[in-house]
Amino acid sequence: MTMELTGNELIKSKLIDIPERSGVYRMFDANKQVIYVGKAKNLKKRLTNYIKTDLDTKTLRMVANTCSLEYSITNSEVEALLLEAQLIKKFQPKFNILLKDDKSFPFIKLRLDHDFPQLLKYRGRALNDGKFFGPFASATEVNTTLSELQKIFKLRSCTDNYFNSRTRPCLQYEIKRCYAPCVGKINKKDYAELVGQVKDFLQGRSKELQENLSKKMEELSEQMRFEEAAEIRDRIKALSYVQLKAGITDIVKDADIIAIVEKNGHYCVEVFLYRIGQACGNIPYFPTSTENSTKEEVLKHFLLQFYQKQQVPPGIIINHEIDDKDNIIEAIRNINDFAKLSITIPASGGKLKLVQNAQENALFSLEQYLKKFAKNQELMFEVKELFNLPEIPERIEVYDNSHIQGKFAVGVMIVAGKSGFDKKEYRVFSLSSRDSITGSSKSTNNDSISCFLDTVDKPRYDTKGDDYEMLRQVLTRRLTRLKQEPHRLPSLMIIDGGKGHLGIVKEVMNKLQMDIPFVCMSKGPDRNAGLEQFHMVGREVFTLNKNLPLMKYLQILRDEAHNFAIKNHRLSRSRAIKVSSLDEIEGIGDTRKKALLHYFGSYKAVSDATLDELSKVKGISKSLAKMIFNALHKN
């Protein structure tokens, strides 16, 4: 039996067949996971570098872990850049420089498919079916802007169903935040004029808008329509205030200002967004796997990964030179199908000041990040020592569940590591129960956490409100998935539970032939915080001093999982209650349920309706209306 070649011996054996062409290569470990993706102008020359003896520590580790190698030939270097960026995004190899937080930026969307359009927050790349303004650096920026615009222009903010169901103005009209087009308090022409003013403001034509409003105010005053003139005056004042807060500049119109800084081998890339001369916020990024990398390498990889997800402005202004700039510009243009793009480094003037400001912000962000990182590193070492782990943990998974006597049961998993919580890795498990509503429990929340129902094919069990059965179900599904995703194996699993839960974890691990360090964390005799007990295989139950930083850290992990479980349980319960409140009424099938929802716009509106209002719905007789009313008000 011959030994399989690995490391530089493997690469040496492949070199004879590798062409001197541009392309992309992929290195795989023993688990057949992609650990590195690279591009090359000349594949043979690039891969020959890996058999040299003077490689840095990171590259030596990478080569030593390489058990197989694949490559793809491309027609050009630009094509190689594009393919490399796509594969890095797909496989997230551990030795590549990675942009972990790649959420798309939010926009403000003005709907164009309704007689009375509304402004909405929108996140995504498909900018169609409306007029879009942005991007903004955070949801907070969008929410603040929407709130200000709502006060100034009073456009509607309700859903179409709610809009169609109104017979009288809602609270938004009473507090002067909406003109109530739903009940005819404003006509289409006047509303369209307001929509035009919103467009002018969001497109940067504030000066012209204020001039037009001033003229209109004078006309209304001359016509003795003083109340309407006062409203226009207040709008002009509010617009001036918002414009002052926005920080309008004539130095740049549409551009991203990007600054990279480095300290102790860690990098921060700060991005400032400017659209129509207005600052739309800034956000710091901390690329990973940057060991032994240069600023130039990190910035280049950042640009290629960042603009796979984000909208590209005509100008990108950076603080550090990059080689191969023309190819990078071409690659970004190809990703976004964008005709015009420049990447520049200012030498003087206002643009240089903007870059310097971005650089100062990046330094501050990096210092804060390093303080947090150092604290987490110290805690990770203490976790290793406390639980006798073979190495400092890279990934900790914490499990909990939530239910009411077995109903609406959900299990959750949260993930933490040296850089804090990794919310993209959070998972929600919808659990089977005879009385609970099951199905997908994909969660959305204010932090835009990326979590989803685990989709492994698995046997379903009836949990019957049994915590142990719920844990068995969650772990069976999770560990089955981990067999397919060994790169996601945790260094430690923490389960909210005690001695009984310990037995369940052992049982599932043995059944699936898995061996992952785990600990069960219970509240202690009186279920008081600070008296937690830890249960491990082969060790006596032990506690920690409640004032230790490590104890506080473990409590934070447990509480994060607990809160996440409760949140998703409430979502599951809310969805189920909405459905069952109508479904349980005799004589209400899908057709009548849809008729009620179409007429009133929401479940709450159905619940709030009077007997007379219910009987006006097509297909609902007076006797059925009475049954519905009594059923919805029985408590």
From Swiss-Prot:
Residue ranges of domain GIY-YIG in the record: 20-97
Subcellular location: Cytoplasm
All copies of domain UVR, residue ranges: 207-242
GO molecular function: DNA binding; excinuclease ABC activity
Keywords: Cytoplasm, DNA damage, DNA excision, DNA repair, Excision nuclease, SOS response
CDD domains (alphabetical): GIY-YIG_UvrC_Cho
Cellular component per GO, a single term: excinuclease repair complex
Any single Pfam family the record assigns to this protein: HHH_5
Chief site of localization: cytoplasm
Domain of life: Bacteria
Any single biological process term in GO: SOS response
UniProt xrefs under PANTHER family: UVRABC SYSTEM PROTEIN C, UVRC/OXIDOREDUCTASE
Function: The UvrABC repair system catalyzes the recognition and processing of DNA lesions. UvrC both incises the 5' and 3' sides of the lesion. The N-terminal half is responsible for the 3' incision and the C-terminal half is responsible for the 5' incision.
Entry-linked HAMAP family: UvrC
Quaternary structure annotation from Swiss-Prot or TrEMBL: Interacts with UvrB in an incision complex.
Family the entry assigns: Belongs to the UvrC family.
UniProt protein name: UvrABC system protein C
Phylogenetic placement of the source organism: Bacteria, Pseudomonadati, Pseudomonadota, Alphaproteobacteria, Rickettsiales
